[in-house]
Amino acid sequence: MNKQISKKPAQRTIALNKKALHDYYVEQRFEAGLVLEGWEVKSIRAGRVQLRDSYVVFKGGEAWLIGAHLSPLPNVAEYMKADPQRSRKLLLNKREIGKLFGAVQKQGLTVVPLDLHWHKNHVKVEIVLAKGKKTHDKRETIKRREWEREKHRVLKSHG
């Protein structure tokens, strides 16, 4: 009668920012909540989200997600002004905001969203403290990835 309960809650990914992994070295990860309107949650459920050119800025001691595109559904009420590119407040502890803000100011790092996912019944965004890659670093990453693929291909055919 003892049922084992999974310790790790299921996280369903809604949107990924693959470009962030290509353009930045990930230093540290944080999970933040989002302040959303009702139509935005419906759009997220429908998968109409894009994080490609989004980033995080700090204004007045708060963190804001800029550039995330949430396309409104066609049946959004006409009296609502649905702005797909609006700034969305991130819900973080003061300690986390201070740590991120300090790293951005002192070390010149960037804060970008990596993915949007469901945690229980809430939409969360995984933001990362990141350092920009140079062009030659990107090329090196691509070469390494292609070499790994080739290695696996050769081992698979001979094994």
Swiss-Prot record:
Keywords annotated in UniProt: Cytoplasm, RNA-binding
InterPro entries listed in its UniProt record: SmpB, SsrA-bd_prot, SsrA-bd_prot_CS
Presence of keyword Cytoplasm: yes
The UniProt record lists the keyword RNA-binding: yes
Subcellular localization(s) per the UniProt record: Cytoplasm
PROSITE patterns: SSRP
Pfam families reported for this sequence: SmpB (PF01668)
GO cellular component terms, semicolon-separated: cytosol
Highest taxon, organism lineage: Bacteria
Single Gene Ontology BP annotation: trans-translation
Xref: SUPFAM superfamilies: Small protein B (SmpB) (SSF74982)
Annotated GO MF terms: RNA binding
Xref: CDD domains: SmpB
Described purpose of this protein according to its UniProt entry: Required for rescue of stalled ribosomes mediated by trans-translation. Binds to transfer-messenger RNA (tmRNA), required for stable association of tmRNA with ribosomes. tmRNA and SmpB together mimic tRNA shape, replacing the anticodon stem-loop with SmpB. tmRNA is encoded by the ssrA gene; the 2 termini fold to resemble tRNA(Ala) and it encodes a 'tag peptide', a short internal open reading frame. During trans-translation Ala-aminoacylated tmRNA acts like a tRNA, entering the A-site of stalled ribosomes, displacing the stalled mRNA.
Family: Belongs to the SmpB family.
Cross-referenced NCBIfam families: PRK05422.1, smpB
Protein name in the entry: SsrA-binding protein
Organism: Coxiella burnetii (strain RSA 493 / Nine Mile phase I)
